[in-house]
UniProtKB/Swiss-Prot annotation:
Composed of an N- and a C-terminal domain. The N-terminal domain carries the tetrahydrofolate (THF)-binding site and the C-terminal domain is presumably involved in positioning the Met-tRNA substrate for the formylation reaction. GO terms for cellular component: mitochondrion. This is Methionyl-tRNA formyltransferase, mitochondrial. The keyword Zinc does not apply. Methionyl-tRNA formyltransferase that formylates methionyl-tRNA in mitochondria and is crucial for translation initiation.
Length: 389
C-alpha cells in the first residue's frame, strides 16, 4: 500500500502543509493495495524504459546522458529511450529533436507521445503541463530536471532570473511532476553550486545542464528508493520565474543602476538585445562593457551636470558612455538599421548632430526609455491597420 501511494502521489506532506485535493483517479489508486495493482510489466529494478520530454540545449544534455546510459550495456540502466519534443518552424527542429534524429532515437512531436509502454518519464525544459492521464501511464511517474533550487524560481526561466536577480547560489532539482501546476512536486535530489561572478545565463545554463544530467542518472540508478525518500517542497521561499518578454529588454535609464543593467545584459543579452530610444529611433545595444576608473576620471564626465540617458563618445577607449541612475555603462557596438561600432555610431550620428547643435548639452542628445506597446495594444493596432487596408 505505502509503495503504491508514493509512486502515484508522492511522499507524505510535511506537518501543517496543504495541498490541493487529489483527483478521483489518484484517490482510487491510493485505495488499492500494491498487490492488487501490480502489473507483471512493471519493473522493480533497471533497466528502465524511458520517455523523454524536452526542447532546448539544457534538455539536450539530459537526453545525451540518458542515451549514453542506454548505450552502456554493462551497466544496464536503460534499455528503451524515446523522445517527445515541440514542433519548430526550423526544418532541423529544436536541439532535442536534432540530437534524437542524429542518434536514431524514436521522436514524436507534441501532443503525440507515442503508444509504447514505459516505466518512467523524464522532463527537462518542456514548457507544457502534463495531465494526470499521461502521468498515470508511467508506473514510476515523471521526473523533472529543473535548473534551480526549488521552491526558488519555479517556472519557465529559472536560469535567467537567477542571473537577473544577482543570486550567488543556485543548483538543480530532480523532482516528481504533479498535474495542473509547474514545479511543485516532491524533491528527489537537489544539489547547489555557486554562481560564477559575472556569469551569463547561457554560461550558467551549461554548468547546470551537466550537473542535472549527472543527477538524473544517479536518481535512475536508485529510482524506487529515491521516490520513497522524496520530500515535499517547503512552503516558504517560493518564487516564480516567468518568461522574458521584449519589454524586459528596454533599459530604464532613470530607474536602473549600472549593476542592474549589466545583470540584465548577462541574463538576456544573447536572446534579446537590450534596447533604447534615440531621436525617435530604436537602438539595440549589442556589446556592453564596464567602465574603468581611468575613463571615469575624464574631466568631460565630471565637469558637467548629466541626467540619465546622456551619451558621450570616449575616443581613447572607443566606447559610448551612457549615464544611468548611479553611474556609467560602456557600449562597444549598437544596431541602428545595421550593426555599428561605437566609433561608427559617433561618426555617423552623434558627431553630425553636435555639429548642427553646437551649443547643445549631452542631455539633449540622450538615450531614452523605449516604451513597447502591450500585446493588447499591438493586436488592436494590427486590427485597425487591417480595417484601413
Amino acid at each position: 500500500m505505502r509503495v503504491l501511494v508514493r509512486r502515484c502521489w508522492g511522499p507524505p506532506l510535511a506537518h501543517g502543509a496543504r495541498r490541493g485535493r487529489p483527483s478521483p483517479q489518484w484517490r482510487a489508486l491510493a485505495r488499492l493495495g500494491w498487490e492488487d495493482c501490480r502489473d507483471s510489466r512493471v519493473r522493480e529494478k533497471p533497466p528502465w524504459r524511458v520517455l523523454f520530454f524536452g526542447t532546448d540545449q539544457f534538455a539536450r544534455e539530459a537526453l545525451r546522458a540518458l542515451h549514453a546510459a542506454r548505450e552502456n550495456k554493462e551497466e544496464e540502466l536503460i534499455d528503451k529511450l524515446e523522445v517527445v519534443t515541440m514542433p519548430s518552424p526550423s526544418p532541423k527542429g529544436l536541439p532535442v529533436k536534432q540530437y534524437a534524429v542524429q542518434s536514431q532515437l524514436p521522436v514524436y512531436e507534441w501532443p503525440d507521445v507515442g503508444s509504447g509502454e514505459y516505466d518512467v518519464g523524464v522532463v527537462a525544459s518542456f514548457g507544457r503541463l502534463l495531465n494526470e492521464a499521461l502521468i498515470l501511464k508511467f508506473p514510476y511517474g515523471i521526473l523533472n530536471v529543473h535548473p534551480s533550487c526549488l521552491p526558488r524560481w519555479r517556472g519557465p526561466a529559472p536560469v535567467i532570473h537567477t542571473v537577473l536577480h544577482g543570486d550567488t547560489v543556485t543548483g538543480v532539482t530532480i523532482m516528481q511532476i504533479r498535474p495542473k501546476r509547474f514545479d511543485v512536486g516532491p524533491i528527489l535530489k537537489q544539489e547547489t553550486v555557486p554562481v560564477p561572478p559575472k556569469s551569463t545565463a547561457k554560461e550558467l545554463e551549461a554548468v547546470l545542464s551537466r550537473l542535472g544530467a549527472n543527477m538524473l542518472i544517479s536518481v535512475l540508478k536508485n529510482l524506487p528508493e529515491s521516490l520513497s525518500n522524496g520530500r515535499q517542497q517547503p512552503m516558504e521561499g517560493a518564487t516564480y520565474a516567468p518568461k522574458i518578454s521584449a519589454g524586459t529588454s528596454c533599459i530604464k535609464w532613470e530607474e536602473q543602476t549600472s549593476e542592474q543593467i549589466f545583470r540584465l545584459y548577462r541574463a538576456i543579452g544573447n536572446i534579446i538585445p537590450l534596447q533604447t530610444l534615440w531621436m525617435a529611433n530604436t537602438i539595440k545595444l549589442l556589446d556592453l562593457v564596464e567602465v574603468n576608473s581611468s575613463v571615469l576620471a575624464d574631466p568631460k564626465l565630471t565637469g558637467q551636470a548629466l541626467i540619465p540617458g546622456s551619451v558621450i563618445y570616449h575616443k581613447q577607449s572607443q566606447i559610448l558612455l551612457v549615464y544611468c541612475k548611479d553611474g556609467w555603462i560602456g557600449v562597444r557596438s549598437v544596431m541602428l538599421k545595421k550593426s555599428l561600432t561605437a566609433t561608427d555610431f559617433y561618426n555617423g550620428y552623434l558627431h553630425p548632430w553636435y555639429q548642427k547643435n553646437s551649443q547643445a548639452q549631452p542631455s539633449q542628445c540622450r538615450f531614452q526609455t523605449l516604451r513597447l506597446p502591450t500585446k493588447k495594444k499591438q493586436k488592436k493596432t494590427v486590427a485597425m491597420q487591417q480595417c484601413i487596408e
